[in-house]
Amino acid sequence: PAKVVYFGYGVYPISKNDGAARNQIVLSVNAHGFLNGQPREYYENLKNGELKGYAFNEKENQDPETTYFNGMMLRLIRSLEYVKSLPEWNGKDLTVEGHSQGGMQAAIAAGLDKDVTMAIPNQPWMCDMGGAALGHLRGNWHIKPTAALFYYDPVFHIRRYDGRLKVLAGLGDYVCPPSGMAALYNNAKGPKEIVYTQGAGHTGNAKGEK
């Protein structure tokens, strides 16, 4: 089996996850095009310079080809291609998972790659971006919706996926409201479940009544 893990918003290095790599391949993926394993100053310079506020640039977000998410999703596709090329992969079990921005990537990965068999988006970001115009809840940390960004809404991508899906939602999450997770769940075609945690904020490891 193989698992590909994606991570939340930010400018930081990604390290390998040996703890999860028991009896399976685990690939932890950096959403960006920079190097891992560099000195702290390397990431601080990117965080305060080139990548400051990445993905929030309104001009870039007018075109699906120029938005920051374009490169992010190309890296996502390549990560899956790489894992599937490994001779150790059994050729049939492929899981994608992640929290927040990583949850968004996991849901989109499921829609883009027909070989994904299990998707676990945990409080995924960017779900139901156009929903606010219809009176749906909107997170308090959101990107201004544009027509171009709808290409990157996980709610649409999940329609292409018919594998197993487990969505995790926090009922106290004001960054990625659970209504967006419900829209994602409702659009999925295959075997699916959604787990709501009472009072849970945008933690990624929600504790409380399920």
Report residues per predicted region.
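Active-site loop signature of alpha/beta-hydrolase-fold enzymes
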Residues: 13-14, 34-36, 127, 203
